[in-house]
Every structure is written in C-alpha cells, then in structure tokens.
Amino acid sequence: MSAAENRALVERWYRALENNDFDAIFEMHHDDVIYNMVGNTLVSGRIYGKDACCNGMIGEKLLEKLIPEEIRFATSWKIIAAEGNRVVGLMQGGGPTKSGEMYDQTYCEIFTIEDGKIKEMHAFFDTVLVEQCLFDNTLSTPEQPLADPFQIN
C-alpha cells in the first residue's frame, strides 16, 4: 500500500473512534497486531494479538472504567506524518469515568501498516492521568523531612 492509502486507513480508524465503532476498529487490525503502550500502568506494556489488543486492552481495561454512552476517544485528531508503511497521529478524547473523574487524554500514536491492516501501534499518553482517573491511584508520596536542607551529599 502507498503512504496515502496507509494514511487513509488511520483516518478511518480515528473516525471509527469518534463514533465508538469498535467493530470497525477490530476489523482494521491485523490478526497478529502488537500494541506498545508507554509506561508502567495497568494498560501499559506490549500486547499481542487482535483479541488481546481490541477486546482485552480497549474493551476490558479501558471501557470498563468509563461510562460507555459518554466516552469519545477521538474528539479531535490529526495525522502528523505518513511515510512508507508508517503513520503518526495525535488524538484527544475521553469522558467521564465510573468513579466520577474526567478522563481527557492526549495520545501520540505511531502505526505500522501491513497488508492493509494495522500491524503495530506505539501509543504515548499521560500515564499519571491513567493512574489517577482510571485506577484511583493518587500517586502521593509521603513527605520526608530533611535533616539539614542545606546539606549536599
């Protein structure tokens, strides 16, 4: 496929996210797709396979924390670059969580396209927001008093 065709596929992917059309999203993925999710959160890591990426990571780990009727993963998006079999996009989206938080996330995604399907995706996003809004982790660290604040070790 050409860079223009790969770009068009990712544009369809973002439009499907705008409309919460998860069946269309599922069909756009290669059976052996790999998701590379930044960070050390419960949605981070390297995820293998269409079912694990689409139903497991998106369906179980994300959608179960959000109010499905109100979530819009792609409220705005833009393709930044398309060259060869790679496409880079920026996306903003989110909505209310079941715990009452607002999950408004910004993503940078790098797609690799193979045989007209998404073969691999690297996703970069605010992992602190994921922890706080989706997994109720305040990430607070107890204050440690300094013995001598002017001492340098």
Language model: regions and residue ranges:
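Short, aromatic-enriched amphipathic alpha-helices that serve as compact interaction elements
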Residues: A3-D21, M28
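Hydrophobic pocket/interface hotspot
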Residues: V10-W13, I25-F26, V33, C53, ...
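A solvent-exposed, acidic/Ser-Thr-rich amphipathic alpha-helical stretch
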Residues: H30-R86
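A beta-strand edge to alpha-helix "cap/lid" segment located at domain peripheries
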Residues: S2-E5, K61-N153
